[in-house]
Amino acid sequence: MEQEQDTPWTQSTEHINTQKGGSGQQTRKLERPNSTQLMDHYLRTMNQVDMHKQTASWKQWLSLKDPTQESLKIHVLKRWKLFNKQEWTN
């Protein structure tokens, strides 16, 4: 029977229970998360990423000094191209 490979996703979502054994040594028991836990973890992670992107975007926007309509247009187009390039690579 093939053993499931651990991926960064499963490693980050595994729940580790530490228990003391009879000899006083600690044992670790790994539990695989169920689909509800995975979805909850995914949604929380994506929400944090979206908030970070929005904050970074606003900070950049506010850092522009005396923006003209043309400079804003160039800035927005550059950000759009970069965003689309990242979307295609992911």
Swiss-Prot record:
Principal localisation: host cell
Q: Where in the cell is it found?
A: Host mitochondrion inner membrane; Host nucleus; Host cytoplasm, Host cytosol
Could you tell me the keywords of this UniProt record?
Answer: Apoptosis, Host cytoplasm, Host membrane, Host mitochondrion, Host mitochondrion inner membrane, Host nucleus, Host-virus interaction, Inhibition of host innate immune response by virus, Inhibition of host MAVS by virus, Inhibition of host RLR pathway by virus, Membrane, Modulation of host cell apoptosis by virus, Viral immunoevasion
Where are the annotated coiled coils located?
none
Q: Write out the ranges of the annotated region (Disordered).
A: 1-34
The record's similarity note reads: Belongs to the influenza viruses PB1-F2 family.
Q: What is this protein called?
A: Protein PB1-F2
Annotated organism of origin: Influenza A virus (strain A/Duck/Czechoslovakia/1956 H4N6)
Q: Which gene encodes it?
A: PB1
